[in-house]
Amino acid sequence: MSDHLTSYDVIVIGGGHAGCEAAEASARMGARTALVTHHFATIGAMSCNPAIGGLGKGHLVREVDALDGLMGRVADAGGIQFRVLNRRKGPAVRGPRAQADRKLYAAAMQAAIRETANLTVVEGEADQLIVADGQITGLRLADGRPLACGAIVITTGTFLRGLIHLGEKTWPAGRVGEAPALGLSQSLEAIGFRLGRLKTGTPPRLDGTTIDWSAVEMQPGDDPPEPFSVLTQTITTPQIQCGITRTTTATHDVIRANVHRSPMYSGQIKSTGPRYCPSVEDKIVRFGDRDGHQIFLEPEGLDDTTVYPNGISTSLPEEVQLALLPTIPGLERVRMIRPGYAIEYDHVDPRELEPTLQTKRMRGLFLAGQINGTTGYEEAAAQGLVAGLNAALTAGGGEPIVFDRADGYVGVMIDDLVTRGITEPYRMFTSRAEYRLTLRADNADQRLTDKGIALGCVGGDRARFHRTKMDALEAARSLARSVTITPNEAAKYGLTLNRDGQRRSAFELMAYPEIGFSEVRGIWPELGTIGPAIAVHLEIDAKYDVYVRRQSEDVDAFRRDEGLVLGDIDYALVPGLSNEARAKLTAARPWTIGQAGRIDGMTPAALGILAAYLRREARRSKAMV
């Protein structure tokens, strides 16, 4: 961390998952950066579940790591149970996940922030954006201190006019025990942003010493654990098991008898919650025919007896929560440390953003995380990284970076947000990516690290490691393609191939479902020189090779459309557009022809007119030179 200043290139508001990535990325790019947060001690706090990664989300963590972000390394330092979800399925849809020790995770994040050059942590409450001539010029804190800057990244999470609901009770808070951010919402509204409201929730916290662990199914992690970061060689933190139990019909009876007291059903909460992380009362109402719902009992730390019961998020009154817990196997005598609650907060329509995460309405203002309508630590971290990089580039007068849908899940997420907007908190899934065969968690560094090196956001250690790894992988591919065998020769090793007389390489053989690296190494001992980690990549590459080559044609077509940049076109001057198309384009302000095509109701004819207009304008500009 740097000494305290009053003038910065970039100011990041909020020390959560988006804010930490934004601040560190900005500072890594050489920008003098301030991270404004209420208290240094809350930096990196895991407000809800003590876990990182999962399906779709694990891809985002790997992509953050590939661009030298923090989350992967910090999760590796704090992880106490690692599992790859969907391991029985193909690599494209596998999701690395880690259960984390809250204290270890926060300590590792705080250490990383403390050690970052060009970065100052400013303790205080962000209150008012300072604007001049349509450009962000600074920030005023609640105590009156002004901070000058060239760009601001807002990453306020659930703090924007946060309001906690617990049964009939409500009180203003950003999360339990912490004050909300009120002035920033007013400042955004004064600029012209229309704010919406979203809702999320969290389950009660339990005393693990009062759980009957013998009555629940125990779930161990993977052995050996698979880290998130390519820079993590081994996981040295002790590993734990989690428990699995279920709600019962008795649980459901308690909830049904009291559902009218839930803020979601009493009318007290009118905002929308996350579809894929419903409250337990939502589950009972929406899936009334189910006789039980799974609950994961997740320890919150190695030296902490607190347990997070993943699956029973609720805002029912405290006494109702106390009544429903003993109806769950293993929790008959459990002590509740803290009740669950729901929280409502402000958000901005993400269609107000460019793909750089800069707002269209105000130059120099970037938004990342839950303020954009997303839910989840990983979604926030990935947005924070992109916003931080672009804030630094903007403040320094550079060209912004855009990650598209073929680059990674981070590009898919941002494109979904800025093109389609949200009607509920957005969560990442592998199903959202049309190029998921190439956007795998295992190849995030192969897709993005070279881009990061060219951009200047990847440090020397990672760059050297990456080049060494890529050289080794290319050598392994060459070796695997250089050794060949005929069907008759393969039969001697127990392999059944089409007897067409064609010689097949080791690389081609690994494309067969029943043939892996161990089988081809048994035929060609020289393949034994390939290290285990590289061998895993080599086998996955071989399995997907034909499909990836086929999908690359789709990616090329996509990139051609993405290469046609619309910029600040006045759509009133484009002849031939229908009034409907003109209105939609003017409202959405798409970045490229490709993005315009993803606007609901946009026709191929309208896209053809736009492409023809761009070509005419390009010829006209060239003729004038």
Swiss-Prot record:
Disulfide bonds: none annotated. GO terms for biological process: tRNA methylation; tRNA wobble uridine modification. It is found in: Cytoplasm. One of its GO terms (molecular function) is flavin adenine dinucleotide binding. FAD binds at G14, G15, G16, H17, A18, G19. Keywords: Cytoplasm, FAD, Flavoprotein, NAD, tRNA processing. PROSITE patterns: GIDA_1, GIDA_2. Its cofactor is FAD. NAD(+) binds at residues 273-287. SUPFAM superfamilies: FAD/NAD(P)-binding domain. Coiled coil: none annotated. Belongs to the MnmG family. PANTHER family: GLUCOSE INHIBITED DIVISION PROTEIN A, PROTEIN MTO1 HOMOLOG, MITOCHONDRIAL. NAD-binding protein involved in the addition of a carboxymethylaminomethyl (cmnm) group at the wobble position (U34) of certain tRNAs, forming tRNA-cmnm(5)s(2)U34. Homodimer. Heterotetramer of two MnmE and two MnmG subunits. HAMAP family: MnmG_GidA (MF_00129). This is tRNA uridine 5-carboxymethylaminomethyl modification enzyme MnmG. It comes from Bradyrhizobium sp. (strain BTAi1 / ATCC BAA-1182).
